Amino acid sequence: MRDALNTGLIEFLKASPTPFHATASLVQRLEAAGYKRLDERDSWDPETGGRYYVTRNDSSIIAIKLGKQSPLLNGIRMVGAHTDSPCLRVKPQPELQRQGFLQLGVEVYGGALLAPWFDRDLSLAGRVTYRRDGKVESQLIDFKLPIAIIPNLAIHLNRTANEGWAINPQNELPPILAQVAGDERIDFRALLTEQLAREHELIADVVLDYELSFYDTQDAALIGLNGDFIAGARLDNLLSCYAGLQALLAADSDETCVLVCNDHEEVGSCSACGADGPMLEQTLQRLLPDGDTYVRTLQRSLMVSADNAHGVHPNYADKHDGNHGPKLNAGPVIKVNNNQRYATNSETAGFFRHLCMAEEVPVQSFVVRSDMGCGSTIGPITASHLGVRTVDIGLPTFAMHSIRELCGSHDLAHLVKVLTAFYRSRELP
């Protein structure tokens, strides 16, 4: 099981260079398992025991397995994650021609570690909107090949480089795509038109707009002397998306189960398809009776917010509280913050720990050092919108928000096992 899950994760990461592609990958796997699409613009008539999914903006998805009995009896089991990761996004008018090189201007998306983006073989993917035969349409594209790079400045020209330096995103992050003659002018949208023709065999009249991200072309891989680790891009938080999907597909219970994977978590979640938007609430309102029954059902429900945790780094162990240093390959982490940066409370943490113990899955705890600030997740946002009890958990990771992150190769199986047990659980606290 562990090897198959790790292989599947690596394939999922490769197919998901952007939130749009991650959502498409999730859709493909859900449809293969018999899930049917619900269009938000249509009237819904879901069947008891039916399996459905809803997408919004092509970058967020909610999968629903309706139970054979009313969710009012035993509530809804929900797992939440997010599809986006920090990256470099292409600007609307990106063409830069400097010193005989074609470069593209980029905007930093989210809280990215910038230094690792230098000297990497980069490709470009995302969504392109165009006009064809008088109609406005959109398609996903992925160049796949390494078409760009951000070369470092040689140490001979920057003698203090190893002492740390502030990276200027405006001046230092535009990737190089090609050499060009002095009088040659490159139209980036024309390049996108060519890519649409190559990838989809369609001829666009004009490219109207796009949402494109650079990404590292190096595939995720099992690494380490004993294969103890998985290294790859976008583990935060496609690792949790994949774990939630595998658990949902494996759960054969009669309970109502939901997997929600939102976009825009890395930039605050405040969007129509983000956790701070109405997508999940609106979806549940259309599936559940209004008023009293809706509120009662949510009060019987529970959300597991799954987002990677900071593993204790052997070179920087003092960055963790001495009693709360999660270790790689030692199981999922219950994340606690008394200032509500995480939504965990004693009841939800106790229930998750109970599930882990019952499944013989190791479990850990994380609390940030008292002299450091704490990040957050979709957990508190979802809890405050729905009033649903929530526990924040995640798998330990190194190099979070780097272009290449690291997790334990045993932990995915641990998380899938306990999330499957959660979906199958007959009673919630």
From Swiss-Prot:
GO cellular component: cytoplasm
SUPFAM superfamilies hit by this protein: Aminopeptidase/glucanase lid domain, Zn-dependent exopeptidases
Names of the cofactor(s): Zn(2+)
Binding annotation for Zn(2+): 82, 156, 401
Keywords: Aminopeptidase, Hydrolase, Metal-binding, Metalloprotease, Protease, Zinc
Regions crossing the membrane: none
The enzyme's E.C. designation: 3.4.11.-
Disulfide linkage: none
Superkingdom per UniProt: Bacteria
Family: Belongs to the peptidase M18 family.
PANTHER family found in the cross-reference section: ASPARTYL AMINOPEPTIDASE
Protein name: Probable M18 family aminopeptidase 2
Gene: apeB
